[in-house]
Amino acid sequence: MSKIYKSLIPISSIFIGIYAFGVYAFLELGVAVHPIMKANFRAHPAAIYFHIFPSLIALLLGPFQFNEKFRTTKTHLHRLIGKVYLLCILVGGISGLYMAQFSFGGTISHLGFALLAVLWIFTGYKAYSSIIRKMIVAHYHWMIINFALT
């Protein structure tokens, strides 16, 4: 894998994270979305924030977990960040599953976002259960899938 490609994922994750943080932390809720979604955001602010901020934390933490030097030299920190990441996935996934019913775009959109939330939680569970059983390669593969969903 080229150095450019390897750096593209963390850089884009950080920029997306900075943008999302700015929009949801400093702007009026719903200002950056379609007017119909703005009403949904305002009707369910707690669910939106329980989805956005844990998901944002996961998005920002994820790339560091894939850095081989970090994983091998800072094992304790890798494990701690991994637990925080998976907790964020769980909270973001549950709130995302709840919010899927209010998504913009009809039934297909509702089902797509619900499936995304279920797969996000499922792959996080599989990654965690793999590492608990010392299946490091399986854990790594499940985490790649999980972060791709992130």
What is the meaning of each model-derived region?
Residues 1-150:
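Alpha-helical membrane insertion/targeting regions
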